[in-house]
């Protein structure tokens, strides 16, 4: 599933450039992805859209508080991923509403604890879905595990 998410980032400049889900599924299958992974990725993206709609209200809340993770979140995310999310937030890359979306999408992953490389992909996809400007150094960090990628 995560390979498909990175593929979408690399091949579509914005989420609006992606075709409808059925057409996208056919293109992904033609690119060699497994149908089960395609279904997982499309479901994950649907969840991303739903979470984004719910987090719109958070955009107006003051972002002066400290995020306290529940035990379940801590177990699913792990120390390394929580540290990375905190790093992105303190660097000004990930505002509180987007942080909550990253956490929600990470909790939707079956991996426990989720690896740092997958958290990076999730953060990248959340920023991509919001068409956020991503500094080149941050982009390099988010894509660090996989070697060279095509930059937008």
Curated annotation (Swiss-Prot):
Cysteine pairs bridged by disulfides in the record: none
Domain of life: Bacteria
Listed Pfam families: DUF494 (PF04361)
Stretches that traverse the bilayer: none
Family membership noted in the UniProt record: Belongs to the Smg family.
Name of the protein this chain belongs to: Protein Smg homolog
Organism: Bordetella pertussis (strain Tohama I / ATCC BAA-589 / NCTC 13251)
């Amino acid at each position: 599933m995560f390979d498909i998410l990175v593929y979408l980032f690399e091949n579509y400049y914005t989420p609006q450039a992606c075709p409808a889900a059925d057409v996208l599924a056919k293109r992904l299958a033609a690119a060699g992805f497994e149908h089960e992974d395609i279904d997982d990725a499309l479901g994950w993206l649907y969840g991303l859209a739903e979470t984004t709609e719910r987090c719109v209200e958070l955009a107006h809340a003051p972002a002066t508080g400290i995020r306290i993770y529940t035990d379940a979140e801590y177990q699913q995310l792990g120390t390394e991923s929580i540290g990375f999310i905190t790093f992105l937030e303190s660097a000004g890359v990930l505002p509180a509403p987007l942080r909550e979306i990253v956490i929600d999408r990470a909790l939707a992953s079956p991996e426990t604890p989720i690896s740092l490389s997958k958290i990076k992909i999730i953060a990248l996809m959340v920023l991509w879905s919001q068409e956020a400007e991503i500094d080149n150094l941050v982009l390099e960090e988010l894509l660090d595990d996989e070697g060279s990628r095509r930059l937008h």
